[in-house]
From Swiss-Prot:
Function: Bifunctional enzyme which can phosphorylate or dephosphorylate isocitrate dehydrogenase (IDH) on a specific serine residue. This is a regulatory mechanism which enables bacteria to bypass the Krebs cycle via the glyoxylate shunt in response to the source of carbon. When bacteria are grown on glucose, IDH is fully active and unphosphorylated, but when grown on acetate or ethanol, the activity of IDH declines drastically concomitant with its phosphorylation.
A Gene Ontology molecular function term of the record: AMP binding
Record key words, sorted: ATP-binding, Cytoplasm, Glyoxylate bypass, Hydrolase, Kinase, Nucleotide-binding, Protein phosphatase, Serine/threonine-protein kinase, Transferase, Tricarboxylic acid cycle
Species for this entry: Escherichia coli O157:H7
Record-annotated active site: 371
Annotated transmembrane regions: none
Gene Ontology biological process terms, A to Z: glucose metabolic process; glyoxylate cycle; tricarboxylic acid cycle
Signal peptide from the UniProt entry: none
Enzyme Commission identifier(s): 2.7.11.5, 3.1.3.-
Annotated localization: Cytoplasm
Catalytic activity annotation: L-seryl-[isocitrate dehydrogenase] + ATP = O-phospho-L-seryl-[isocitrate dehydrogenase] + ADP + H(+)
Chain sites annotated for binding ATP: 315-321, 336
Protein name: Isocitrate dehydrogenase kinase/phosphatase
HAMAP family xrefs: AceK (MF_00747)
């Protein structure tokens, strides 16, 4: 290779990332217009388009590099010099951290995810940690109650860029003040002030004002979801001020926010104070930088591995028929490998399973489907693998494993947030906790269905419980769109003997689903059956599912709330007039 080519390649990669992030910001900047026009289908399409941008631009850069090098192979020294030149371009670069991830992605595409070493890749960042502790321009604006909280909130709302008419601004402000007074008390509230992010966070059918409530005793989240009435008027649906509530809003089972972030590291650093339980990976994920979130997730895994003496074990729960799932006992993630062969009743291919996981990545997850990171050629030290798990890996996924002596390489796997399997949770709880779990499960099914997702396999073992008690779906191999399913009533038996026969007395075609049968799987436990009949009996009726299908086909997009119905101002305070 001619000398000087290394710098050209480094510059080409960085320019490619510039182009990618420019398009990322362009798609994001359209969020306000889509919200104001109530174009909810365009919201969904923009989300999918933005997810695809990264891989598309990686592909463009790879083609450029193949032209530059005329397809010639490169030696190790050449690659090290390319990375060295690239590193020198980053100290003054505003999106250095994602630029490093982009470099990694280009390298992996060029070399088929092989030789992934710290010398060749940015396994850890080359730049100082938390470089944006001080930021080049303010991300937020402070508001003080010099003339009272009503005046303060009027200024906050008047500063918003939204151009639609407000339904009742005075009412919403009084709702917020009432909530803050109940939360803090009048004296503490008078000594508190707000810091509000300059940019709104858009997702689904809401625009979120995100801020910090700075009180004498500490800083709290301050989140206002702004919605539209059917007449296109704005209203504030609630006010959330606890870290638990904020954590759910920014949760791993939700779609990514559309928020204009030319300095993503600075925004992540700003958010960290009101989301202390979120990892760096989860914060990047929440603002839509999912590929860099994957980098950060891998770094978090490496840091944990270096500081523990644990071995990987099979994950607790009922063993899956499609996926082999393992974990580290103290780590909050699970690792999922597609088995070489599936159970006979699972008539599908590995390609189908991967397509299902990609569908979930691109779809609105409505807070009910766990996000995943996909890895290729994932290296594990054998000393970190328990003998029982090693035996299981070789038994169930040998075709995906390469033995390197002291290491193994798993050709393909997913990493996902670890949860307590719902079937295990239900065995361990009683009383109100049991009731809450069944209510959550039914709500999860309803919200998935309203978002045009049918889980396929609705058994409790395919759902997990988060640390906030939310029920989330995580087994995607039978997932499909609601509109692809034929929901049928079971025909009445022709003769009394029909009900005793081993075979059904009616025809069953692919895609047929009989909701009446759900009762047999979900209500067998006498503790659970009555709760189901009380709260979710309509899930056992085919006409319920068909009605949802009709709404989806008519183009209706349901509202998705990242909080309980009882927290909505309209429920808490009613239509109080001010």
């Amino acid at each position: 290779m001619p000398r000087g080519l290394e710098l050209l390649i480094a510059q080409t990669i960085l320019q490619g990332f510039d182009a990618q992030y420019g398009r990322f910001l362009e798609v994001t900047s359209g969020a306000q217009q889509r919200f104001e026009q109530a174009d909810w289908h365009a919201v969904q399409q923009a989300m999918k388009n933005r997810i695809h941008l990264y891989d598309h631009h990686v592909g463009l850069v790879v083609e450029q590099l193949r032209c530059i090098t005329n397809g010639q192979s490169t030696d190790a020294e050449f690659l090290l010099r390319v990375k060295e030149h690239y590193t020198r371009l980053l100290p003054d670069y505003p999106r250095f951290e994602i630029a490093e991830s982009f470099f990694n992605s280009v390298y992996c595409r060029l070399f088929d995810h092989r030789s992934l070493t710290p010398e060749r890749l940015f396994i850890f960042s080359s730049q100082p940690e938390r470089r944006f502790r001080t930021i080049p321009r303010p991300l937020a604006k402070d508001f003080h109650p010099d003339h009272g909280w009503e005046s303060l909130l009027m200024r906050v709302i008047s500063d918003l860029p939204l151009r639609l008419h407000w339904q009742n601004k005075s009412r919403d402000i009084h709702y917020i003040i009432r909530h803050l007074t109940e939360t803090l008390g009048p004296e503490n509230l008078s000594k508190s002030h707000l810091q509000v992010a300059n940019e709104l966070f858009y997702r689904n059918k809401a625009a979120w004002l995100v801020g910090k409530l700075i009180t004498p005793s500490g800083t709290l989240p301050f989140l206002l979801p702004i919605h539209q009435t059917d007449d296109g008027e704005l209203f504030i649906d609630t006010c959330l001020t606890t870290t638990a509530e904020a954590s759910i809003v920014f949760g791993f089972a939700r779609s990514y926010f559309m928020v204009y972030a030319p300095l993503p590291a600075a925004l992540v650093e700003w958010l960290r104070e009101i989301l202390p339980g979120k990892t760096t990976a989860e914060l990047y994920m929440a603002i839509g930088c999912q590929k860099h979130a994957k980098t950060e997730s891998y770094r978090e895994y490496l840091v944990y591995l270096q500081g523990c003496n644990e071995q990987f074990i099979e994950a607790p729960g009922i063993r899956g028929m499609v996926m082999l799932v393992f974990t580290l006992p103290g780590f909050d993630r699970v690792f999922k490998v597609i088995k070489d062969k599936f159970a006979p009743q699972k008539e599908m291919s590995a390609a189908h399973v991967r397509a299902c996981y990609q569908l979930v990545k691109e779809h609105d997850r409505v807070g009910r489907m766990a996000d995943t990171q996909e890895f290729e050629n994932f290296v594990l030290e054998k000393r970190h693998i328990s003998p029982a798990l090693m035996e299981l890996l070789l038994q169930e996924a040998a075709e995906k494993i390469t033995d390197l002596g002291e290491q193994i390489v798993i050709r393909h796997l997913y990493i996902e947030r670890r949860m307590v399997p719902l079937n295990i949770w239900l065995e361990q709880v009683e009383g109100q906790q049991l009731r809450d779990a069944i209510e959550e499960y039914g709500n999860a099914i309803r919200q998935l269905a309203a978002a045009n997702i049918f889980p396929g396999d609705m058994l409790f073992k395919n759902f997990g419980v988060t640390r906030h008690g939310r029920v989330v779906f995580y087994d995607y191999d039978e997932i499909c769109y609601m509109t692809e399913v034929n929901f049928r009533d079971i025909p009445p038996p022709r003769y009394p003997e029909d009900e005793l026969a081993s075979e059904p007395w009616y025809s069953v075609s692919p895609g047929d689903v009989f909701p009446e049968e759900f009762r047999h799987w979900l209500c067998a436990d006498p503790r659970i059956g009555p709760l189901f009949e009380e709260m979710h009996a309509d899930l056992f009726r085919a006409d319920y599912w068909r009605a949802l299908q009709n709404r989806i086909r008519e183009g209706h997009v349901e509202d998705v709330y990242a909080y309980r119905r009882r927290q909505r101002f309209s429920v808490r305070y009613g239509e109080m007039l001010f």
